Amino acid sequence: MPKTLHEIPRERPATPLLDRASSPAELRRLGEADLETLADELRQYLLYTVGQTGGHFGAGLGVVELTIALHYVFDTPDDRLVWDVGHQAYPHKILTERRELMGTLRQKNGLAAFPRRAESEYDTFGVGHSSTSISAALGMAIAARLQGKERKSVAVIGDGALTAGMAFEALNHASEVDADMLVILNDNDMSISHNVGGLSNYLAKILSSRTYSSMREGSKKVLSRLPGAWEIARRTEEYAKGMLVPGTLFEELGWNYIGPIDGHDLPTLVATLRNMRDMKGPQFLHVVTKKGKGFAPAELDPIGYHAITKLEAPGSAPKKTGGPKYSSVFGQWLCDMAAQDARLLGITPAMKEGSDLVAFSERYPERYFDVAIAEQHAVTLAAGMACEGMKPVVAIYSTFLQRAYDQLIHDVAVQHLDVLFAIDRAGLVGEDGPTHAGSFDISYLRCIPGMLVMTPSDEDELRKLLTTGYLFDGPAAVRYPRGSGPNHPIDPDLQPVEIGKGVVRRRGGRVALLVFGVQLAEAMKVAESLDATVVDMRFVKPLDEALVRELAGSHELLVTIEENAVMGGAGSAVGEFLASEGLEVPLLQLGLPDYYVEHAKPSEMLAECGLDAAGIEKAVRQRLDRQ
């Protein structure tokens, strides 16, 4: 059994076996008797490195044994191993020639937080969003068949990610094409079955054995010649297995289901994977693990230890600065508005903690809906609720709303339904990198007819604009970033603002800075040195055209500032209006560049994009010098 630790090591632990397994090839030279000791060392090293850098935590601890077994049995990187989401991939990185680089994890120019093709040949598919692994591994399996290659394709997916429709679409397609691939369900929530133990492990070994597989294939060849006989035999086998193991659903989808087995029992994992490696057709292995395994605090609080920040030296922990988190402001607003309006319903696609819906879910459980990882369903669910006079609020990360774009247009906007989208994590998100950045929501929202799109500049503005969007008759979106605000006083009243009207925060001379969002604070820092007018635009759509027209007539340069892609963003909206009016004032658009900004600290990313105070001032002065 894995050893259980109670503290994160502050000193690098001794790992003599792990030092001999820097690559899967070296790992495969170890004896099976060494693997359990290797697992203990890998878990200690993982605790140490994540303690130094911060990062996703519990999921990786839970798949230490599974990761070792996969690389021990399969010929990676020639065999294709695809991790879903990637939260659990740190042990994989350690075993695939990146152990000594783990100290750079999630840092600028360091290792990415998720598997990434450009980083290693062992990262066969770049991930970050959930439920993509089975589709990707199926594509690889089909390619191998067409290329005449014998390589294996393996997808590892969690029980949460398996709830998404895309995963079931891939399962269905794989059975249709009879793909030679293996899907491993990493069930770390016990949401599918508690049926784990000696009997399940024994059955898994039997059902995955060469003898059983040969008998099954031989019987299939004989019985397939007899009309109806093979179908009767198949159903009999399925019924017998279904009485003992909970795989009927997957068997119905055309998969050979094995499990559930203990995902921390290395001998069973290795034996079962060896048996399944050479089995033909779609194979499904159900493995039960414990999130946070081997670290007592994480086992007791798997949600709280999903990710951690880096350890600070004793007595040196930084004091909290700034205001409340934007997500907390949203969570409080949701509860306050719900107290006033019984029609309000809260919807989240598996982001209760991240979007700060915990208090709402506890106060109004009958009005709270966590639809799991099902963004498309979340949006159309809200549309159906709105059809019946309810007031749904969809709390969703910007990067995940992309997954429901058709539903946003077809099911909500075309019907002009009254749905409010509270779009969290808008803009750059720091160490999680480009897969989690909300770089495009202004661009993909402002082109939708009838959509109200708002960009608050601080905590108080967020509360006001949420109220404005909630009271608006039609689809509305409020985008706000990860992290804390500037500690602006918050008006407790639920008061809306006038739609389509910006606010001039400072009057200046030659330059007008038109700010869409939280960069207002950075713009104010340089306003005096630039003698600039500073405007909190508030609304991307409808744009405050009267204000833009007035600013164009009284300034030599207009500068738009947004934490969104420049292409198609708020600056583009201003440029389109100026062109339509024949206003020839120069326009400088500052925002995210036309490339994916790699993971780093948020301050480093903003500096790279020229969206901090220094970058804004530099860009404006360079433009003025050319005029």
Curated annotation (Swiss-Prot):
The keyword Transferase applies. Keywords: Isoprene biosynthesis, Magnesium, Metal-binding, Thiamine biosynthesis, Thiamine pyrophosphate, Transferase. One of its GO terms (molecular function) is 1-deoxy-D-xylulose-5-phosphate synthase activity. PROSITE patterns: TRANSKETOLASE_2. Pathway: Metabolic intermediate biosynthesis; 1-deoxy-D-xylulose 5-phosphate biosynthesis; 1-deoxy-D-xylulose 5-phosphate from D-glyceraldehyde 3-phosphate and pyruvate: step 1/1. Pfam families: DXP_synthase_N (PF13292), Transket_pyr (PF02779), Transketolase_C (PF02780). Its EC number is 2.2.1.7. The keyword Cell membrane does not apply. It catalyses: D-glyceraldehyde 3-phosphate + pyruvate + H(+) = 1-deoxy-D-xylulose 5-phosphate + CO2. GO terms for cellular component: cytosol. CDD domains: TPP_DXS, TPP_PYR_DXS_TK_like. Thiamine diphosphate binds at H87, G128, H129, S130, G160, A161, N188, F295, E375. Gene3D superfamilies: 3.40.50.920, 3.40.50.970. GO terms for biological process: 1-deoxy-D-xylulose 5-phosphate biosynthetic process; isopentenyl diphosphate biosynthetic process, methylerythritol 4-phosphate pathway; terpenoid biosynthetic process; thiamine biosynthetic process. Its cofactor is Mg(2+); thiamine diphosphate. It comes from the Bacteria. Mg(2+) binds at D159, N188. Binds 1 Mg(2+) ion per subunit. Binds 1 thiamine pyrophosphate per subunit. Homodimer. Catalyzes the acyloin condensation reaction between C atoms 2 and 3 of pyruvate and glyceraldehyde 3-phosphate to yield 1-deoxy-D-xylulose-5-phosphate (DXP). Belongs to the transketolase family. DXPS subfamily. This is 1-deoxy-D-xylulose-5-phosphate synthase. It comes from Pseudomonas aeruginosa (strain LESB58). The gene is dxs.
